[in-house]
Amino acid sequence: MKVAVLGAAGGIGQALALLLKTQLPSGSELSLYDIAPVTPGVAVDLSHIPTAVKVCGFGGEDASPALVGADIVLISAGVARKPGMDRSDLFNVNAGIIRNLIGQVARTSPNACIGIITNPVNTMVPIAAEVLKKAGVYNPNKLFGVTTLDIIRSNTFVGELKHLDPATLDIPVIGGHSGVTILPLLSQIPGVSLSEREVAELTKRIQNAGTEVVEAKAGGGSATLAMGQAAARFALSLVRAMQGDENVVECGYVESDGEYARFFAQPLLLGKAGLVQRLSIGTLSAFEQDALESMLEVLRKDIALGEDFINK
């Protein structure tokens, strides 16, 4: 199994690469790419960690040496949020980066499963889909927006509030991956009941958790460590599924059946070829139903922005 990380010299990329070096199955290959010249050095640094995972690193404009033979490509390249920016402010810079990198993936490793971490995910995934489509290699079962950070934050915040071990929780989060489009299904936690006020406050905190980190870092960056952990969790689940484990389920942002929007985050059954089945979002509470209906216009606009970036 070969996993490539594009954007590997950044805060998320380095955290993700460290976790993959220590947790990928023995015999795996980890391939790191970043435009920054430090990237081969990051690979050398990681290579000293005693696990049976081979690491190589590539810098410069051309990502293709890192992509040859990749089974999974994780993309965290781009600029990070600073105070006062929201994820959509990142669009102007990051859209061009994703267009370029996905073009290289389409040429070099067209059959790889792709996980988009770069924000705004709501818009970057449609950009990736349109680039792959133009290249004639788009497979909707192999393109994922990584929304796992919303799930782990939900687990953490509910665990804190209810004095539970967050590792025992797995709260589904649907919709998208910014602001109001993030909808944690807090009515679906077995054995945990929350008041209306708790639900409203938790939902808001989960939706705004990224801003909480940006402000706490006081201009020094955005969420890199928790995002690295979230991306590693998603990637390792995908690796397990691709190697034949059954019943591997993670939430992710994928091309959907179109009931709510062209792309939608929901629980996914993963398998050897990527996405096997979009699972039901279950029965929503009245609060969740209202939140879902009121976010869809925002989500659809985010998606259209990405489509238009490539097609206009």
Swiss-Prot record:
GO MF annotation: an example: L-malate dehydrogenase (NAD+) activity
List of catalytic residues: 177 (proton acceptor)
Keyword Transport applies: no
Assigned keywords, A-Z: NAD, Oxidoreductase, Tricarboxylic acid cycle
Residue positions binding NAD(+): 7-13, 34, 94, 117-119, 227
CDD domains: MDH_glyoxysomal_mitochondrial
Protein's GO biological process: malate metabolic process; tricarboxylic acid cycle
Enzyme Commission code: 1.1.1.37
The UniProt record lists the keyword Oxidoreductase: yes
Amino acids binding substrate: 81, 87, 119, 153
Pfam families with a match to the protein in the record: Ldh_1_C, Ldh_1_N
InterPro entries the record matches: L-lactate/malate_DH (IPR001557), Lactate/malate_DH_C (IPR022383), Lactate/malate_DH_N (IPR001236), Lactate_DH/Glyco_Ohase_4_C (IPR015955), Malate_DH_AS (IPR001252), Malate_DH_type1 (IPR010097), Malate_DH_type1_bac (IPR023958), NAD(P)-bd_dom_sf (IPR036291)
Catalytic activity: (S)-malate + NAD(+) = oxaloacetate + NADH + H(+)
One GO term describing the cellular component: cytoplasm
Subunit structure of this chain's protein: Homodimer.
Function according to Swiss-Prot or TrEMBL: Catalyzes the reversible oxidation of malate to oxaloacetate.
Family the entry assigns: Belongs to the LDH/MDH superfamily. MDH type 1 family.
Stated name of the protein: Malate dehydrogenase
Lineage of the species this protein comes from: Bacteria, Pseudomonadati, Pseudomonadota, Gammaproteobacteria, Enterobacterales
